[in-house]
UniProtKB/Swiss-Prot annotation:
One function term, GO molecular function aspect: ribosome binding
Protein name: Ribosome maturation factor RimM
Signal sequence bounds: none
Main subcellular localisation: cytoplasm
Subunit structure: Binds ribosomal protein uS19.
Domain PRC barrel positions: 95-169
Function: An accessory protein needed during the final step in the assembly of 30S ribosomal subunit, possibly for assembly of the head region. Essential for efficient processing of 16S rRNA. May be needed both before and after RbfA during the maturation of 16S rRNA. It has affinity for free ribosomal 30S subunits but not for 70S ribosomes.
Keywords: Chaperone, Cytoplasm, Ribosome biogenesis, rRNA processing
Length: 173
Protein backbone atom coordinates (compact mmCIF):
# COMPACT_ATOMS: atom_id res chain seq x y z
CA UNK A 1 0.00 0.00 0.00
CA UNK A 2 1.25 3.47 -0.81
CA UNK A 3 1.03 6.41 1.56
CA UNK A 4 1.10 10.10 0.59
CA UNK A 5 3.84 12.02 2.44
CA UNK A 6 3.65 15.30 0.53
CA UNK A 7 2.10 17.21 -2.36
CA UNK A 8 3.54 19.88 -4.63
CA UNK A 9 1.34 22.93 -4.08
CA UNK A 10 2.95 25.36 -6.54
CA UNK A 11 6.11 26.76 -8.03
CA UNK A 12 7.99 29.28 -5.91
CA UNK A 13 10.07 31.87 -7.72
CA UNK A 14 11.64 31.46 -11.15
CA UNK A 15 14.45 28.99 -10.49
CA UNK A 16 12.44 25.76 -10.14
CA UNK A 17 11.89 25.78 -6.39
CA UNK A 18 8.62 24.13 -5.30
CA UNK A 19 6.30 24.69 -2.36
CA UNK A 20 5.44 21.29 -0.85
CA UNK A 21 2.59 20.55 1.56
CA UNK A 22 3.97 18.05 4.07
CA UNK A 23 1.81 15.06 5.02
CA UNK A 24 4.30 13.17 7.18
CA UNK A 25 5.34 13.52 10.80
CA UNK A 26 9.01 13.19 9.84
CA UNK A 27 9.69 15.75 7.08
CA UNK A 28 13.35 16.16 8.10
CA UNK A 29 14.00 12.53 7.14
CA UNK A 30 11.62 12.19 4.18
CA UNK A 31 12.69 15.41 2.45
CA UNK A 32 16.38 15.50 3.44
CA UNK A 33 18.93 16.66 0.88
CA UNK A 34 19.88 13.65 -1.24
CA UNK A 35 16.63 11.78 -0.57
CA UNK A 36 15.01 10.11 -3.56
CA UNK A 37 11.22 10.33 -3.61
CA UNK A 38 8.65 8.66 -5.83
CA UNK A 39 6.19 11.20 -7.20
CA UNK A 40 2.82 10.37 -8.76
CA UNK A 41 2.34 13.02 -11.44
CA UNK A 42 -1.04 14.75 -11.81
CA UNK A 43 -3.58 14.05 -14.53
CA UNK A 44 -2.51 10.44 -15.10
CA UNK A 45 1.08 11.40 -15.89
CA UNK A 46 2.55 8.27 -14.34
CA UNK A 47 5.30 8.33 -11.75
CA UNK A 48 8.81 9.70 -11.56
CA UNK A 49 11.69 9.69 -9.09
CA UNK A 50 12.87 13.00 -7.62
CA UNK A 51 16.17 13.71 -5.88
CA UNK A 52 16.12 16.52 -3.29
CA UNK A 53 18.87 19.10 -4.00
CA UNK A 54 17.91 21.67 -1.37
CA UNK A 55 15.19 22.24 1.19
CA UNK A 56 14.13 25.09 3.46
CA UNK A 57 11.04 26.06 5.43
CA UNK A 58 8.90 29.03 4.40
CA UNK A 59 5.43 30.02 5.73
CA UNK A 60 4.63 26.58 7.12
CA UNK A 61 5.60 24.71 3.97
CA UNK A 62 8.81 23.29 2.64
CA UNK A 63 10.48 24.90 -0.35
CA UNK A 64 12.31 22.15 -2.20
CA UNK A 65 14.55 22.14 -5.24
CA UNK A 66 14.75 18.84 -7.12
CA UNK A 67 17.46 17.72 -9.54
CA UNK A 68 16.41 18.43 -13.12
CA UNK A 69 13.81 21.08 -12.22
CA UNK A 70 15.57 24.34 -13.01
CA UNK A 71 12.92 26.87 -14.05
CA UNK A 72 9.40 27.96 -13.26
CA UNK A 73 7.86 26.23 -16.29
CA UNK A 74 9.29 22.85 -15.25
CA UNK A 75 8.14 23.49 -11.68
CA UNK A 76 4.62 24.53 -12.74
CA UNK A 77 4.22 21.30 -14.71
CA UNK A 78 4.67 19.34 -11.46
CA UNK A 79 1.89 21.10 -9.53
CA UNK A 80 -0.29 18.50 -7.78
CA UNK A 81 2.37 15.76 -7.79
CA UNK A 82 1.95 13.43 -4.80
CA UNK A 83 5.01 12.00 -3.06
CA UNK A 84 4.47 8.39 -2.06
CA UNK A 85 6.13 5.82 0.21
CA UNK A 86 5.35 2.14 0.51
CA UNK A 87 3.86 1.33 3.92
CA UNK A 88 6.08 -1.76 4.16
CA UNK A 89 9.06 0.65 4.33
CA UNK A 90 7.71 2.38 7.46
CA UNK A 91 9.29 1.54 10.81
CA UNK A 92 7.04 -0.35 13.26
CA UNK A 93 5.35 1.66 15.99
CA UNK A 94 6.15 0.38 19.46
CA UNK A 95 3.68 2.52 21.44
CA UNK A 96 0.27 0.78 21.46
CA UNK A 97 -1.48 4.17 21.58
CA UNK A 98 0.14 5.49 18.38
CA UNK A 99 -0.95 4.75 14.84
CA UNK A 100 -0.09 5.65 11.29
CA UNK A 101 -2.90 7.53 9.57
CA UNK A 102 -3.38 4.76 7.00
CA UNK A 103 -4.04 2.27 9.81
CA UNK A 104 -7.06 4.30 10.95
CA UNK A 105 -8.49 5.09 7.52
CA UNK A 106 -11.28 2.68 6.68
CA UNK A 107 -12.04 1.70 10.28
CA UNK A 108 -15.67 1.68 11.39
CA UNK A 109 -16.59 4.25 14.05
CA UNK A 110 -19.27 3.54 16.61
CA UNK A 111 -20.41 4.98 19.91
CA UNK A 112 -19.94 3.19 23.24
CA UNK A 113 -23.49 1.82 22.99
CA UNK A 114 -22.70 0.31 19.57
CA UNK A 115 -24.49 2.84 17.34
CA UNK A 116 -22.78 3.13 13.95
CA UNK A 117 -21.37 6.58 13.21
CA UNK A 118 -19.52 5.96 9.93
CA UNK A 119 -16.09 5.15 8.54
CA UNK A 120 -12.81 7.08 8.93
CA UNK A 121 -12.04 8.60 5.52
CA UNK A 122 -8.90 10.46 6.60
CA UNK A 123 -6.96 11.85 9.54
CA UNK A 124 -6.64 15.64 9.44
CA UNK A 125 -3.65 17.31 11.07
CA UNK A 126 -4.63 20.83 12.09
CA UNK A 127 -2.96 23.46 14.28
CA UNK A 128 -5.59 22.66 16.93
CA UNK A 129 -4.87 18.93 16.89
CA UNK A 130 -5.79 15.83 14.94
CA UNK A 131 -9.31 15.19 13.69
CA UNK A 132 -10.87 12.02 12.34
CA UNK A 133 -12.90 12.76 9.22
CA UNK A 134 -15.74 10.25 9.48
CA UNK A 135 -18.15 9.65 6.60
CA UNK A 136 -21.55 8.87 8.01
CA UNK A 137 -24.93 8.26 6.50
CA UNK A 138 -25.62 10.05 3.23
CA UNK A 139 -21.83 10.64 2.87
CA UNK A 140 -22.04 13.41 5.49
CA UNK A 141 -18.68 14.31 7.05
CA UNK A 142 -18.34 14.33 10.83
CA UNK A 143 -15.12 15.73 12.31
CA UNK A 144 -14.23 13.91 15.53
CA UNK A 145 -11.42 15.35 17.68
CA UNK A 146 -8.78 12.62 18.07
CA UNK A 147 -8.42 12.98 21.85
CA UNK A 148 -8.63 10.30 24.53
CA UNK A 149 -11.70 11.91 26.13
CA UNK A 150 -13.68 11.20 22.93
CA UNK A 151 -11.84 8.35 21.19
CA UNK A 152 -12.04 5.72 23.91
CA UNK A 153 -10.67 2.65 22.11
CA UNK A 154 -9.13 1.58 18.82
CA UNK A 155 -9.01 -2.03 17.69
CA UNK A 156 -7.04 -2.58 14.51
CA UNK A 157 -7.84 -6.31 14.72
CA UNK A 158 -11.61 -5.67 14.85
CA UNK A 159 -11.31 -2.61 12.55
CA UNK A 160 -13.35 -0.50 14.99
CA UNK A 161 -12.93 2.83 16.76
CA UNK A 162 -15.22 3.51 19.70
CA UNK A 163 -16.06 7.07 20.61
CA UNK A 164 -17.85 8.80 23.48
CA UNK A 165 -18.95 11.98 21.71
CA UNK A 166 -19.98 15.05 23.68
CA UNK A 167 -23.61 16.01 23.30
CA UNK A 168 -24.30 17.54 19.89
CA UNK A 169 -21.06 16.46 18.16
CA UNK A 170 -22.79 13.97 15.91
CA UNK A 171 -25.52 16.50 15.07
CA UNK A 172 -23.04 18.98 13.58
CA UNK A 173 -22.53 18.98 9.83
Amino acid sequence: MELVVGRIARAHGVTGELSVEVRTDDPDERFAVGSVLTGRLPRGGGSRRFTVESVREHSGRLLIRFAGVSDRDAADALRGTLFMVDTTDLPPIEDPDEFYDHQLEGLAVRTLDGAAVGTVSEVLHTPGGELLSVRGSERREILVPFVSAIVTSISLADKVIEIDPPEGLLDLS
